[in-house]
Amino acid sequence: IIAVIVASLLAVKEHLHKFAKKIQMNEVFAAIKFALISIIILPFLPNENYSILDVNVISKLLAPFPSFSSFIGQLDVFNLFKIWLMVVFISGLSFVAYILVRLIGSEKGIGLTSFLGGMVSSTAVTVSLSEKSKGKKFITPFVFGIVLASSIMFIRVLIEVAVINNSLVSKLILPLIAMAFVGLISAFIVSKIKKQDVKEKVSFKSPFALGHALKFGLFFVFILVLSKTLFLLFGDKGIYIAALVAGLADVDAIVLTLSSLALTGLEPRVAVLGIILAVCSNTLVKIGIAYFSGDKKMAKRVLIILVLSLIVGISVALLV
């Protein structure tokens, strides 16, 4: 066995050297630190739902206000084990793509960078390529990159739903695949208009940086509380409002939230529509970023393609 391991290491020695050169040590340490913290902390976190009324001091402070206290008590969304598990899941999903982006590098062209970047952060790809499109003679590669990354986001959302609540996949797969299909086909057509490729570097923060993970965790908790609050106040409409608002900032948190809530009482149709609304909201934000941060001609092409993707996806959702 040892001989096989040694032989295998020698066979990939050159690739390991290349890997070491492209991955910075602080990124390695960040990943190790994150993994250790998760392994050590996760098993000890309580896997039960709490509300802030379970904090004795807060419970006493709200005791004179029974109606408000009763409402707050219904916001029992604080499950520390599941919250941190979601952070680990999203960070891990992003980190795989992040490592591939670092290994491949921008010298392989905007196509691969945008494809993998869409799995890390399609918004980051949009911001970076939009800013770099200004003053460029050829804008087609930038349209291609933004549309490609945005289309991959639809697939990423489907993966997240499949992992958290696969019962929703059957209702989401056709609309999301339709959106992705229109975007990917459009990106392919755009790439054939002019053959010029650009090798622009797209910057991402390591998903395993502890600060980045904690920020996502806090935002996820905020979206959980917001969604449950609006649901209690306005019913299904509250979920839709939360989805639209959350999608403006980050699609992952609301996708995880609605997928989780659908396991504990939220109607699947409401969760599905909420996820579609969040995806639409997030896509419209990327169109806005392209317009205000990038070349206007480039942004108009991005707008046409992505809006068409949304229209097709929504139409499919209404038919199924």
Go through the PLM ranges and name each one.
Residues 155-159, 173, 266-320:
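C-terminal transmembrane helix pair
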Residues 2-4, 21-33, 105-116, 137-148, ...:
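Cytoplasmic-side transmembrane-helix entry/capping segments in multi-pass membrane proteins
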